[in-house]
């Protein structure tokens, strides 16, 4: 049987590398859990048991082994398989899994509601240190839930190298491999002793030794059982252990040591690069050449600012490389703080730095800043602290799909008191926004960065907070564009002119505050006003202008051209923008319908 499973693992690993090389995706963690997932499939019943992953980065093999093997080559493509687990995709997917820390809390709910079913949670070693996970562990131990099996996949990485005390705990447990055998021998010896007084003395000794040997003694004292597999890519080791713990009652934790990138030499050598990777050449491991991104522009500029001002600190929640901070981190390691997957903690830490006279920059993806709204309000806004927020991946992100799109942050930042919000429309404006941020002390400042290649305009005027810029001057129709939408509306400018839609185009990087002077004094020239943004339409930039119109008695038709849906699927960014009628011919048709009141 083991030879068959080994062959199966080889076939899955080959298929995985081929598909991800074409579509991009999360390769390293999935290569590491091939044997673990195959063995879980062998021992447990995926149809009857409830299997959860935290996070879904490591669930590709699970998709293949359930009901999606024939469609696996469509993963991350439009209308193909989702990049993460999705209950809308398969009955085997019990819970969505885009963000870290959700599986253990959800498992508690499943375990309570389904006492006769086994709930198996595969948790990454970075996710286990997340606050949600620790809260769930606290409850599981307190209630001694009998039907939960927690498998901690320790590959010593999240996206980059793991940080934090709990990660060090895991390393200590994994390295103390002889502990389990020692403990079993001690228990066996104690059980053979008849004298109660001697037995109690030895039991106290065993507990004392355990407190020194395993850092998880506190959890073990709450009723958890701990087991280790130190060769997590070895079927001969995995199968017997899973059989042993399958029917145990009470909360159980199995620590499995796997190798991220296992079986593909380039992924083994550069684990961070192959965590999440764009399409690449299998023979060389090299990705195909891409255009310069806004994240790169930010990374270069923040390094420059860091050299000028030693009070600048950068913070990221396990996303140093993704947010463009790797150069800053190398140059100023003592001023670049990686907090791990702990967004709320990151924001409050930054507030403490700001309160102490430092200049903190919280660099984080839009989808993850959602996890820190309480801290944004309570710790930053109410105290009006000058914390700078660099919100990367704002707008549609593409292949990572609905759990990762950055289409909510603008709405809640507009709602929170004291925040200034900038959405640069060009690479030059991004640099200017960062230059302004260095000495900005009026309160918290947000600078939003899209997942897009850079765009610039010749002879562009400098960025000013509270002031917009006229890019094209025309008549009848006014287009106010923020962020990426300036590039998009300029792409169709000539076609609009040719169709008789004459217009003025405004670059509006300053979203909060608005350019009230322009709105009060120049709006009356136009028959139609369009506000273009890559954000969910509710409580949007356009809504803020609409409210300003209402408050100031301005009676002009205002059309909000934004994302109509709050849940955008996965696919290429260009495809999704066109589907949302925010690009190209579909945008032109949308504008015509709004002007003429009918479909043309």
Swiss-Prot record:
Superkingdom as given in the UniProt entry: Bacteria
GO cellular component annotations of the record: cytosol
Cofactor note: Binds 1 Mg(2+) ion per subunit. Binds 1 thiamine pyrophosphate per subunit.
Enzyme class: transferase
Pfam family, one: DXP_synthase_N
Keyword Mitochondrion: no
Gene3D superfamilies associated with the record: 3.40.50.920, 3.40.50.970
Protein name from the UniProt record: 1-deoxy-D-xylulose-5-phosphate synthase
Organism (species): Fusobacterium nucleatum subsp. nucleatum (strain ATCC 25586 / DSM 15643 / BCRC 10681 / CIP 101130 / JCM 8532 / KCTC 2640 / LMG 13131 / VPI 4355)
């Amino acid at each position: 049987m083991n030879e068959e499973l080994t062959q199966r693992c080889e076939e899955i690993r080959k298929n995985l590398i081929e598909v991800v090389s074409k579509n991009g995706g999360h390769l390293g963690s999935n290569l590491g859990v091939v044997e673990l997932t195959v063995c879980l499939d062998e021992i447990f019943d995926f149809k009857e048991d409830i299997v959860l992953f935290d996070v879904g980065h490591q669930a590709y093999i699970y998709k293949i082994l359930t009901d999606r093997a024939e469609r696996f080559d469509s993963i991350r493509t439009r209308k193909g398989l989702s990049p993460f687990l999705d209950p809308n995709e398969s009955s085997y997917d019990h819970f969505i899994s885009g963000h870290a820390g959700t599986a253990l809390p959800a498992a508690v709910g499943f375990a309570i509601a389904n006492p006769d079913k086994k709930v198996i949670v595969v948790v990454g070693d970075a996710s286990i240190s997340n606050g949600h996970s620790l809260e769930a562990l606290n409850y599981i131990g307190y209630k001694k839930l009998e039907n939960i099996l927690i498998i901690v996949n320790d590959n010593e990485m999240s996206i980059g190298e793991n940080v934090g005390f709990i990660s060090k705990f895991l390393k200590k447990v994994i390295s103390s491999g002889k502990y389990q055998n020692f403990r079993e021998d001690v228990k066996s010896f104690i059980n053979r002793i008849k004298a109660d007084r001697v037995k109690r003395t030895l039991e106290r000794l065993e507990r004392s030794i355990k407190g020194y040997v395993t850092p998880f003694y506190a959890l073990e004292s709450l009723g958890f059982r701990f087991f280790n597999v130190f060769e997590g890519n070895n079927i001969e080791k995995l199968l017997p252990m899973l059989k042993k713990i399958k029917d145990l009652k009470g909360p159980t934790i199995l620590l499995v040591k796997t190798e991220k990138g296992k079986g593909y030499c380039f992924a083994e050598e550069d684990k961070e690069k192959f965590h999440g990777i764009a399409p690449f050449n299998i023979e060389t491991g090299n990705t195909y050449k891409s255009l310069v991104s806004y994240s790169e522009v930010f990374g270069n500029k923040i390094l420059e600012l860091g050299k000028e001002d030693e009070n600048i600190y950068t913070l990221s929640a396990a996303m140093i490389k993704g947010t463009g901070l790797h150069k800053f981190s190398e140059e100023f390691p003592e001023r670049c703080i990686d907090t791990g997957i702990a967004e709320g903690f990151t924001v409050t830490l930054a507030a403490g730095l700001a309160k102490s006279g430092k200049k903190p920059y919280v660099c984080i993806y839009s989808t993850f800043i959602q996890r820190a709204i309480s801290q944004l309000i309570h710790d930053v806004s109410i105290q009006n602290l000058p914390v700078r927020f660099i919100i990367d991946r704002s707008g549609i992100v593409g292949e990572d799909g609905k759990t990762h799109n950055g289409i909510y942050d603008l709405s809640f930042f507009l709602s929170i008191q004291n925040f200034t919000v900038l959405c640069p429309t060009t690479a030059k404006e991004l640099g200017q926004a960062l230059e302004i941020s260095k000495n900005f002390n009026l309160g918290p400042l947000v600078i939003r960065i899209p997942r897009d290649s850079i765009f610039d305009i010749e002879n562009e005027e400098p960025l000013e907070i509270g002031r917009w810029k006229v890019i094209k001057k025309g008549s009848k129709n006014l287009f106010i564009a923020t962020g990426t939408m300036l590039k998009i509306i300029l792409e169709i400018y000539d076609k609009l002119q040719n169709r008789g839609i004459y217009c003025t185009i405004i670059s509006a990087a300053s979203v909060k505050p608005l350019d009230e002077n322009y709105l009060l004094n120049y709006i009356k020239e136009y028959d139609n006003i369009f506000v273009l943004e890559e954000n969910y339409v509710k409580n949007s930039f356009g809504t803020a202008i609409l409210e300003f119109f209402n408050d100031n008695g301005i009676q002009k038709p205002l059309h909000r051209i934004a994302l109509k849906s709050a849940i955008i699927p996965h696919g290429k960014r260009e495809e999704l923008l066109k589907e949302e009628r925010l690009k190209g011919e579909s945008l032109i048709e949308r504008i015509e319908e709004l002007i003429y009141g009918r479909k043309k």
